[in-house]
Amino acid sequence: MPLYIYTDVYASGSVPRGWVPTRGGTVKYPVRNPAVHRYLRQLLPGRWQKVIKQGNSGAVHYFEHASGQVAGVKYYPN
């Protein structure tokens, strides 16, 4: 499945409009899968990291570039 780059998680269309991130509910770590990391760097060269954000109605998982752009946004309801 190809990954697309968006300006933010809401622009992806995967996150519901009422979703609000919880304070202190963010985990960021390096992309561990070498194939995915290589693919992301082909899309946009630079530093990428995996982000998991907890929110009021579920969690959002995505890859974030150093510029703030995101890819591979997935929403998991509670």
Task: Identify what each model region corresponds to.
Residues 1-78:
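Catalytic toxin/effector domains delivered as secreted proteins or via bacterial secretion systems
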